[in-house]
Amino acid sequence: MLEQMGIAAKAASYKLALLSSGEKNRVLEKIADELEAQMESILSANVQDVEQARANGLSEAMLDRLALTPARLKAIADDVRQVCNLADPVGQVIDGGLLDSGLRLERRRVPLGVVGVIYEARPNVTVDVASLCLKTGNAVILRGGKETYRTNAATVRVIQKALKACGLPEAAVQAIDNPDRSLVNEMLRMDKYIDMLIPRGGAGLHKLCREQSTIPVITGGIGVCHIFVDSSADIAPALKIIVNAKTQRPSTCNTVETLLVHQDIAERFLPALSKQMAESGVTLHGDETVMQVLHGPAKLVPLKPEELDNEFLSLDLNVVVVENMDGAIAHIREHGTQHSDAILTCDMHNAARFVNEVDSAAVYVNASTRFTDGGQFGLGAEVAVSTQKLHARGPMGLEALTTYKWIGFGDGTIRA
């Protein structure tokens, strides 16, 4: 089954690569319209997925990721329309010039070909990835988690209907709708057809892909994100940032999971933090110093060492008091996932040092980690957030779905 999907996707990719920006945008507009027109069928499938997931004991954080509402689906359709408004990188001449040999050389952006994406309970990923791949002239094979296979299947049927209406092969966007996990292993070996693989899920999935895939893999999306409250931090705006970073949508990978507090501000800052977190319903996981300083009103439990590597994806927050900037940076290097980390400070020397020494895809000064997102960065919907350094890093927008080719123009030009 998968080989036939691969053959069809590769054939579709050749046709997609030749489309003009206008043709691709018309397809995306049609997809957005169909998502709204077929909303009832998608939501009906999603209700079944959510009910099954709840019966299987899926956590509330995961259920939130899985659930669609009319408003969320409308927002997804609007995101597709936003992709239409983005500049098409395909065909862009990155650099080049006339060589001494007389050869005129260009380095031009081109589609990757076929992209494979493996993801878990995030039905919005289906549309986000499909729209970005189509905008960049790539075909895509999607493998969502078993928790979302009804939703994904319904969504892909809608996308394929739009493709067909625009005279394009339905195989441009395909989904593996069989939840059998063995198909993941088969997909990882489809290097003959898939040019790049993007896993979006937990550490186990990323490890499997790194170890078993014969396809180039871009990993990311695991966010043990940190905020360091420096000794010079202004407490009121710092609390506002922390509330946003923790509570706006706790199930996302750019949510803060560990708060590092400079010891010189701890006694003034921690009580204010506790009050704010109590109002926000956040449970604090405190180290020894925190446990000694705080006695309410927020719910407080002793921090377990293994929790420092946790992506809670819930209203839980580690709080650790560190001696100084060195301690904060060392902690992030040991426990961070190179996703998103922030410093809250009024000392711009410390801010500059933090930015230079924390090796993460996104580093913030006096801002929430929640900004690490393709839409917030002006990239449109994102394929993933890469925490590695090759071939992309941070939110992966359109350019991350392209490669380049060298094109030489001559006039009977030969090498001397």
From Swiss-Prot:
Recorded metabolic or biological pathway in which this protein acts: Amino-acid biosynthesis; L-proline biosynthesis; L-glutamate 5-semialdehyde from L-glutamate: step 2/2
GO molecular function per UniProt: glutamate-5-semialdehyde dehydrogenase activity; NADP binding
EC number: 1.2.1.41
Disulfide partners: none
Subcellular localization, as worded in the UniProt entry: Cytoplasm
Protein name: Gamma-glutamyl phosphate reductase
CDD domains: ALDH_F18-19_ProA-GPR (cd07079)
GO cellular component labels: cytoplasm
Stated role: Catalyzes the NADPH-dependent reduction of L-glutamate 5-phosphate into L-glutamate 5-semialdehyde and phosphate. The product spontaneously undergoes cyclization to form 1-pyrroline-5-carboxylate.
Family the entry assigns: Belongs to the gamma-glutamyl phosphate reductase family.
Gene name, Swiss-Prot/TrEMBL: proA
Organism listed in the record: Salmonella typhimurium (strain LT2 / SGSC1412 / ATCC 700720)
